């Protein structure tokens, strides 16, 4: 039997960051854990510090082999884009410090892989994540998005597609 690989999915946010952990390597992925890092009541640097420390703690607790994180897309509001970029930066820094490889996927890649269409709704993503992982209830939105990222990475691995090429934007 193939060795189990633990995948940490991250849905970055400046106020709420979703995380989800699955194990890959069997016939289908297995759910390990998920949740949301909430920092909306904090300000500026305290938000970033809390996100960083929380991601480090999650990595220490679950020992993932890889992180699958959603790529940033262009926002109409530059301030929101900067805040999201800062949150992503501390998340990527946590993974780098813990020596966890990072794979990046666009929201469209994740939705296409999990739901079958790149413009799927949050409800559709939650529904598919719940069914694919055989969960008794639907995960929170941000946690579902993070689990979807982990499932996307798992699917690419299962299909034998080199995740490095995916992260570099190679078209298939």
Curated annotation (Swiss-Prot):
Its cofactor is Mg(2+). Its EC number is 3.1.21.10. CDD domains: RuvC. It is an enzyme of class 3 (hydrolase). Mg(2+) 1 binds at residues 11, 142. Mg(2+) 2 binds at residue 70. It comes from the Bacteria. It catalyses: Endonucleolytic cleavage at a junction such as a reciprocal single-stranded crossover between two homologous DNA duplexes (Holliday junction). Keywords: Cytoplasm, DNA damage, DNA recombination, DNA repair, DNA-binding, Endonuclease, Hydrolase, Magnesium, Metal-binding, Nuclease. One of its GO terms (biological process) is DNA repair. The RuvA-RuvB-RuvC complex processes Holliday junction (HJ) DNA during genetic recombination and DNA repair. Endonuclease that resolves HJ intermediates. Cleaves cruciform DNA by making single-stranded nicks across the HJ at symmetrical positions within the homologous arms, yielding a 5'-phosphate and a 3'-hydroxyl group; requires a central core of homology in the junction. The consensus cleavage sequence is 5'-(A/T)TT(C/G)-3'. Cleavage occurs on the 3'-side of the TT dinucleotide at the point of strand exchange. PANTHER family: CROSSOVER JUNCTION ENDODEOXYRIBONUCLEASE RUVC (PTHR30194:SF3). Homodimer which binds Holliday junction (HJ) DNA. The HJ becomes 2-fold symmetrical on binding to RuvC with unstacked arms; it has a different conformation from HJ DNA in complex with RuvA. In the full resolvosome a probable DNA-RuvA(4)-RuvB(12)-RuvC(2) complex forms which resolves the HJ. This is Crossover junction endodeoxyribonuclease RuvC. The gene is ruvC.
């Amino acid at each position: 039997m193939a060795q189990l690989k633990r995948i940490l999915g991250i849905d970055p946010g400046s106020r709420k960051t979703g995380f989800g952990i699955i194990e890959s390597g069997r016939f289908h992925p297995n759910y390990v854990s998920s949740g949301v890092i909430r920092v909306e009541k904090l300000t500026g640097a305290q938000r970033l510090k809390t996100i960083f420390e929380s991601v480090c703690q999650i990595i220490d607790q679950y020992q993932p082999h890889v992180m699958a994180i959603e790529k940033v897309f262009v926002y109409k509001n530059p301030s929101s884009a900067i805040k999201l970029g800062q949150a992503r930066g501390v998340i990527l820094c946590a993974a780098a410090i813990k020596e966890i490889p990072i794979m990046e996927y666009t929201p469209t890649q994740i939705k296409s892989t999990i739901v079958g269409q790149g413009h799927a709704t949050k409800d559709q993503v939650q529904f598919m994540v719940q069914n694919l992982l055989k969960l008794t209830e639907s995960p929170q939105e941000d946690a579902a998005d993070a689990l979807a990222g982990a499932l996307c990475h798992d699917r690419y691995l299962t299909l034998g597609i080199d995740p490095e090429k995916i992260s570099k934007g190679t078209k298939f």
